[in-house]
Each structure stands twice: as C-alpha cells, then as structure tokens.
C-alpha cells in the first residue's frame, strides 16, 4: 500500500506535517487544508480503529461513533492487514497516558 501513495507530492505533504511544532499548528494547518467534514471523517476513522483495538463490537462502535458498519469494516481491514501503524500509535498513546 505504501508504494501506491509514495510520490513527490505526498513526500512534501508529509514533510509539512512533520515540520509542525504542536497541536495548535496541526489544528491551524488542517483547518486550512481540509474541510471540517474531512477532518471529522478522518478523526472518526481513527476513533473506530482505537475502539477496535480495545475489542469493542461493530454494534457498539456504530452506536458510539455513528460510523456505518461498512466504514468500520474498512477500518478493521486497515488495522488487521495494514502496516502496523495503528498498533504503533496506540502503544505510544497508551505509554504517554501512563507517563502522566
């Protein structure tokens, strides 16, 4: 999958993301580059992935997030068959929470 998105434009975009210094800069950047619905949709998918990671059922996830079962299924495929980035991020978030 990574090879399908790897190109100069994506490299520049990712470099731009990595150059942002804090959450406020991320908010400002995404406010400029995306519509509200695009950001909310991405955030919803991330929430679905986290809930799948926690072992929640499709029904519970759908009720809590409003995501369709088709969206949950697509996210589940990414979580289980993807590059492992979700697990890496969830571990980091959980460690950050423990360190508080």
Give, region by region, the residue ranges found by the protein language model:
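Long, compositionally biased
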Residues: 53-60, 92-96, 100
């Amino acid at each position: 999958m990574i090879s399908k998105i790897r190109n100069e434009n994506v490299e520049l975009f990712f470099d731009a993301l990595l150059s942002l210094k804090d959450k406020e800069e991320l908010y400002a950047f995404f406010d400029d580059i995306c519509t509200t619905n695009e950001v909310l949709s991405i955030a919803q998918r991330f929430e679905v992935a986290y809930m799948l990671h926690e072992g929640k059922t499709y029904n519970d996830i759908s009720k809590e997030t409003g995501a369709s079962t088709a969206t949950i299924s697509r996210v589940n495929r990414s979580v289980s068959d993807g590059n492992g980035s979700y697990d890496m991020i969830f571990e980091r978030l959980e460690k950050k929470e423990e360190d508080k």
